[in-house]
Structure formats: C-alpha cells, structure tokens
Amino acid sequence: MTTSGKENFRLKSYKNKSLNPDEMRRRREEEGLQLRKQKREEQLFKRRNVATAEEEAEEEVMSDGGFHEAQMNNMEMTSSAVITSDMIEMIFSNSPEQQLSATQKFRKLLSKEPNPPIDEVISTPGVVARFVEFLKRKENCTLQFEAAWVLTNIASGNSLQTRIVIQAGAVPIFIELLSSEFEDVQEQAVWALGNIAGDSTMCRDYVLDCNILPPLLQLLSKQNRITMTRNAVWALSNLCRGKNPPPDFAKVSPCLSVLSWLLFVNDTDVLADACWALSYLSDGPNDKIQAVIDAGVCRRLVELLMHNDYKVVSPALRAVGNIVTGDDIQTQVILNCSALQSLLHLLSSPKESIKKEACWTISNITAGNRAQIQTVIDAHIFPALINILQTAEFRTRKEAAWAITNATSGGSAEQIKYLVELGCIKPLCDLLTVMDSKIVQVALSGLENILRLGEQESKRSGAGINPYCALIEEAYGLDKIEFLQSHENQEIYQKAFDLIEHYFGTEDEDSSIAPQVDLSQQQYIFQQCEAPMEGFQL
C-alpha cells in the first residue's frame, strides 16, 4: 500500500505494532460495502422514462368525467387486457404509421406509474425483437425514438427483464445510435445503455466490451442540451461502478479527462454523477488512485466538499476519502488542496453520514506521517473529533476513534500529549464497553500508545509514576480493562491482561487477578468478572 522505503520507515516509527500500516490506512470495508449495495437516495442505478403530464392529460381527458373514469379503469385493468390484439397486429404490420402508433401505445403502457406491465410486454412473442428491429430504421427517427423509449423502460426493470433486452441484440445498436443525427434518439439510447450497465457487473462489462466508451465520450465532448449531458454522465458513472469485480480499469480510465471538466458544469445532477464516477475509479489500489490524481481533479473535488447540495458533497467526499487511502505522497496531494478546513466544516454537518465519512477520511490522513498528523492538529480538527467521540451516533464514533488512535500510533510525543490534553482518554475508555470487538481493540491500542508514552516520560523525568495511569483510572478505564480480561475475543483479553500487568500491576498484586493457563488448549483461563455498572453500550 506504500512504497517499500515508506513502509519500513512506518513500521519503525509506529509505536503500536498491533495496528500495522495496512490496517491503519483503511480501504472501505464491511460497512462501506453494505452502503454501496444499498440504493442510495442520492443515486439511482436505473431510471424509467415516464410519460409527460401533457401526454397523460391528453389520454385521460376523454368525455364527461373522463379523468376520474380513466383512473378507475387503470385500477381495474387486468394484466390480460393491457396488451390488445390490435396493438400486436399493428406492430407486426408493414405500415410505418401503424408501427409507430402501436409502439407509442406500448411506450405509454410502460411509462405508467407505479407498476408498468413489463412482464406482459416481454412475454408477448416477438415484440421485444420487433422493437430492436425498429431501432435500425434510420429513415424514421420518430419510430427509432419510440422503440428506444420502450426498450429503456423494459431495461429499467429487474435483471431478468434487462437480460431480455440484451439477448434481443439491442446493446450494439444502441451504441450505434449514440452517433445518430437526432438528439432525441441519442439521448434515449444513452438512457437505455445506462439502465443496462446499471443492472449488474456482468451487464456493465458486456456494455463496455461492446465498446461504448469512445462514442459516449464523443457525445459528452459536444455542447449538448443539459438533459443529454445528465443522462450521459449518469450512464458513465454506471459504467465505472461496481466492486465484485470492478470494471477493467483500462476500459474506463479514458473517461478521466472528460470527468475532469464535467466537474465544472454548473448543474447539480451532472456534478453528482461525475463525482460518483470518480469515487468508483479511485476506490482501489494506489495505481488507480494515481490515475485519478493525474487527471487533475483533486482541487475541484475538494472545492465541491463545500457545495450547498448534499447530493454533490456526498460523492465528492467519498472520492476525496478514497484518494487518501493511498500512500503518504498521494494523501499529501489532497492536503495541499486545503482539504482540512472543508473536512472540519463537514464534521459539524447535520447529516450523520457526512460526519461519518469525514471522520473516515481524516482517519486515513492521521495514518500518515508526523507532518501530516501535525497539519490535522494545526487545522484544529481534533477537538471536533473528540466531541464526536463523545456525542455522535456509534457508527460515526467508530471512525473518530480510528482517527485518534491512528494519531497516537504514528504521532510524536508532543502530538500524543496534545491529544491527552484535549481529553481523548475518557472517550476512548468509554468505547471499551461497546459490543464491536474491532473498536474495543482500536480504543485499547490508543490507550496503550498513551500509556507507553507516559512510561517513557516517567523514566526520563525520574518520577517513576506514569501520569496517564491516573487519568485512565479516573475515567473508569481500569475497571473496564479489568472486565475485558473475560472477553470472548482472545486478542482483547490478552491485550487487557498485558496492559494491567505492565502498567497497573503492583508488587502486592492479588494473584487471583492473573489468569491460569490451560496448557492443553494453549489459552488463558479467566475468571468471570461482574460487568461494570453501566453495562455494554452501543
């Protein structure tokens, strides 16, 4: 994750060997993966083109009371009556007028909210293939457009429904239509391709293998109407999305130069999807991060952290956070863009997910070198982190704990003392009773780093007393560490025992505290302790 020289330096300089550099600088794991699987409010992977208000009014204002009657008819209509024999007959006729009329009827059916009859349409023999055939009618752009709209809405359905469109051979034709002379046809084609690519990594890779990127980037490079640009950059973000497996970077990286100027388009939707695309491209090993940095997007991404719409802030923050999972040099690029002031601002966001993501980003900066930890100190970020550690939701507190423990692991004596003076000990002690084993370990590591410094200071001064032991006891930390000796996690109970033995032991220590050893099982046997009064906290 870092260059070999850097890694050797880090391994020597980190006082806490239980959190190695790879662990400290964390890629998005566990919770992040779950977040990615969810359909975020800010981002839709599939979209249906619905009928306009004018068209619906046109259809529904019939005779006296026609609007109410149409509503009742829609509610009562059975699936068997949705597609009439006339529609099927017309679509297979040789008359262009009848073909267009029938295609429009299908399109209106599939544009209805909330449950379009996609299954009825795809189960009608030959209909999907007929619409794909209509895509080829260059002499009739209206028919092309209507057929593309129908197929877009079929592809907005579930994976099986999307696969029907792929199997009918629509994708290569849609890619050809990106170069159509007619903007409406181009836009509908890009919408369809975005839906198909957004279905799954398999569909995404198939669309990429059909060589969508050159014509899509060509389309984006033109001065288009804004709806076209929105659809195209949304489709592009779907082509970059996905982790298992990620897209072939060689196939998607050519879009970086286009994304770099899309970040300056004055449209919230375009900015949001461009940032999502960059967040996907930067989510990976350092060579991918470097390609994103080389595209020159970092300064603009940092600027967008202060955008007034969370729809933009969220993916911009995700991209910035991914970049600082790289090595120290890559992290420094973000720091050189004055990111810390923006991150400090985001730590007070009313949106919890933004606070959490900002803490995660900072935790990867504090996993850097001492100069980088100092820039975080100079930006007055740690007081806000300690406040979060005491008051925020648990998922956010976890990230703040990583940020503080990372700083105690790689920081200098002065930097660690600064954190102690800010009051980091009590909130770290409070984390010792949570149910999340990993965070208990993180808190223990932070406290161990502080205790180790206290021991060094006491030896240097000749006082013989570790000043931080008393602070931990005052925060009820010792009681909690003692309780952890009966923890089910072996690393936790071993660490708890070691801390007590090394830093809190006395010559007349009660021998009953020390665990017995089960030689047959190669493990310690701990006596059951009563839980502290406050119990486990989440």
UniProtKB/Swiss-Prot annotation:
Its main location: cytoplasm. PROSITE patterns: ARM_REPEAT (PS50176), IBB (PS51214). Residues 149-241 are annotated as: NLS binding site (major). GO terms for biological process: NLS-bearing protein import into nucleus; postsynapse to nucleus signaling pathway. Residues 245-437 are annotated as: Binding to RAG1. InterPro entries: ARM-like (IPR011989), ARM-type_fold (IPR016024), Arm_3 (IPR032413), Armadillo (IPR000225), Importin-a_IBB (IPR002652), Importin-a_IBB_sf (IPR036975), Importin_alpha (IPR024931). Residues 1-38 are annotated as: Disordered. Residues 318-406 are annotated as: NLS binding site (minor). It comes from the Eukaryota. It is found in: Cytoplasm; Nucleus. Belongs to the importin alpha family. One of its GO terms (molecular function) is nuclear localization sequence binding. Keywords: Cytoplasm, Nucleus, Protein transport, Repeat, Transport. Residues 20-38 have a biased composition (Basic and acidic residues). This is Importin subunit alpha-5. It holds the Pfam family IBB. A motif (Nuclear localization signal) lies at residues 42-51. Essential for selective protein import into nucleus. Promotes signal-dependent binding of karyophilic proteins to the nuclear envelope. The importin beta binding domain (IBB domain), which is sufficient for binding importin beta and essential for nuclear protein import confers import only, but not re-export out of the nucleus. Residues 1-57 form the IBB domain. One of its GO terms (cellular component) is nucleus. SUPFAM superfamilies: ARM repeat (SSF48371). ARM repeats lie at residues 77-117, 118-161, 162-206, 207-245, 246-290, 291-330, 331-372, 373-412, 413-457, 460-504. It comes from Gallus gallus (Chicken). Forms a complex with importin subunit beta-1.
